[in-house]
Every structure is written in structure tokens, then in C-alpha cells.
Amino acid sequence: MRATYINQARVHMGYHYPRSYSTAIKSAHYFERFCRDYGFCLHTEFDQVYATSAHFSWTNAAEFRRFCAAAEIRCDDVPPEKYFNPGLCDGTFLTTEYTYDAQVLKRWFLEQLAALPNVEILYSRKPDRIEQAGSVWRVTAGEYTAEAPYLLNATYAGVNDIHAMLGLPPFGIKYEKCEIILCTVDEKLRNTGITVMDGPFFSLMPFGQ
């Protein structure tokens, strides 16, 4: 959840993956599942606009339309000039995609976990050592030691730190810095999300409910 929260808390429908139909289709499937399971934390009342840049984009408007049709996700043409200066984007599309309020979802999960007597959450702890002890995995973090038959590595960008402790080969991950700015917009953009594809461009999304 932290990774998605940092990445604008977007509930992906698949539009970000015009060069991977399988990823887009999986995203659309999980989009429906997330909306069904966690609809209480969603922000849905805004226009989600995707556009393809006329310059330096790996995907043009025609390709984006074909991709959306193949993935069976919404893609309604709107005039690019409604949102952009003339000549900047060769296609602009109204789509279906939402954001979620991570604080609302976090509170819900904490309430669910608090009801489980065998769950303990440790904050501000990093594992010092991970080792296999017979049929269980033993994780040591300072003075705390826990054992479990399975480990789930959900560290996202820190996945290779855990791999190193386990003696596993690292994933070939490329890290990129990204600036996320919280700002107040005027009324023209208050109920609009805009994402320019497909390259080193920008995205503007509503944040929270």
C-alpha cells in the first residue's frame, strides 16, 4: 500500500501499460476486485483523462485506442484542446480510473488486525538477520525474534535488501527518483485527473477523499 500511496494512490485500470496487454488486462481485473472489496475508501467523482503526447512518446493516439480496445477498457475521445495547448497532444481520452484514500484504508486494516489475537505489528524495525530453522523461518530485528512457516517479502523497492539476507540473487531493478507535489488547484482542475503518456511526462491526480 505504501508504494501505491507514494505513486499518487491511483487504482490502476491498466492504462499505464500500452506495451503490455497482459499487464493491462490483469490490472483491469484487479481494479474491479479492489473496487468491490474496498469501495469505502475510493474517490470516484472526477474526470480521469489520459493523453498521448505528440512529441517524445512511445505510444501515439491511434496505438492507444487500439490498446484500450484490445484490453476492453474505456477510452472515449475528447478534443485535446480542452486540456492542452494546440499541438502538444495528438489524442486525449476520458477513461475510468480512481484514487483511494490511503489513510481511510489504513485505519480499516488496523481495525481488522487489532481483532486478531495472534497478530503483532512492529513499527520502525528492520530485520537484522533471516535464517531457516528446520521447517520455519526465523527473523531477528534487534531484541525481537519471530518464527513462521512462510515469509512474504512486501518491501517493494527494498526487495533486494531482503534477498541479500536470504542469499538470493538480486532482481535487476532500475530505480528512478520521482517528485510528488501536494498542491491546491483552481476550480477548473478540482475534479479532474490528467496523465500524459507514454514517456517522461506528468500526471495530476486528486488526493484523498
Regions found by a protein language model. Name each.
Residues 1-5:
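Glycine-rich FAD pyrophosphate-binding loop
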Residues 6, 10, 197-199:
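Short, solvent-exposed loop/turn segments at the edges of secondary structure
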Residues 8-91:
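Dinucleotide-binding Rossmann-like beta1-alpha1 core, especially the glycine-rich loop
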Residues 43, 133, 195-198, 207:
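A short catalytic or substrate-binding loop motif that flags glycine-/basic-rich loops and adjacent residues
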Residues 48, 92, 178-180, 199-201:
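Short hydrophobic/aromatic beta-strand or adjacent loop that forms the aromatic wall/cage
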Residues 93-150, 154-164:
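Helical element adjacent to the flavin cofactor pocket in flavoenzyme catalytic cores
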Residues 144-196, 207:
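Central helical "cap/lid" subdomain
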